[in-house]
Amino acid sequence: MNQASIRRRFDRAGATYERAARVQKLVATRLAALCPGEIHGNVLEIGAGSGLLTRELAPRCHGGVYVALDLAPGMLAHAAMPGARKVAADGERPPFRPATFDFLCSASAMHWYADPAASIAANLRLLRPGGGFAIALYVEGTLWELAEASRATGFGSVYPMRPAAFYRELFANLPGVAATVSEETHVVTHASVGAMLRSLQGAGVTHTPGKKAASPAKYRDFVRYYEERFSREGRVATTYAVVMAHGVRKRTATERL
């Protein structure tokens, strides 16, 4: 995983993310509904981006610091986050000690992790015993229409997401963690294939491991294929598959005494 490439793309999207991130706004709202109405103590948000989830949760927080961490300084520079402390850092290597936070949240970010099994486990160790968490990330099935059109025409490529079962197993086997995991699917439509691609670019969702050289002919083939296969009432569809996980870091027998 090229974290520098991911950071550059989101840095460039800092000024356009809010307008383009339609499904990310929906996912942030859905995740916020799984979070407590009041959150006490220190909070860490990983992948805070432009503040979509931050603005939902920061007003609920009392008696601590709300830390909004993101890999891309360019995103944080454009982010409106009243009441939050911005930190530019990699979520896989956060600059905090274990048992620092009372709540951890992340929307539309951890699927970019190079090693999600190790990194999510490490992230949850940042929680104090009894601390809660809520995480939303994208899984296999996201942008499947774009992936099919790319394979058929040779234009572009799609970042390979892990299957939902990977995360279900991960959260089920994390030591000292009790988690509830659910899955959702959301379909977003655009006026044209060009508008869809511009929206992805505006939201920074352009990193893939295998960029392909694109000719005008391949692009035209891609547009034609996509329109023929995935148009609905004059608009083109894109699908997003989401895993939501929320729960607590359990107290050990010693900590309960």
Give residue spans per PLM region.
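Conserved catalytic/acceptor-binding region of the Class I
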Residues: 130-193, 206-216
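N-terminal, positively charged/glycine-rich alpha-helical extensions of SAM-dependent methyltransferases
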Residues: 1-13
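Conserved alpha-helix/loop element of class I SAM-dependent methyltransferases that forms part
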Residues: 22-40
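A short acidic, Gly/Pro-enriched loop at the edge of an enzyme's catalytic core
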Residues: 92-104
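Conserved Class I S-adenosyl-L-methionine
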Residues: 50-52, 178-257
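A short SAM/SAH-binding and catalytic strip from SAM-dependent methyltransferases
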Residues: 103-116
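A short glycine-rich, Lys/Arg-flanked "PGG" loop and its adjoining helix->strand segment in the class I
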Residues: 117-132
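Class I SAM-dependent methyltransferase SAM/SAH-binding core
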Residues: 44-94
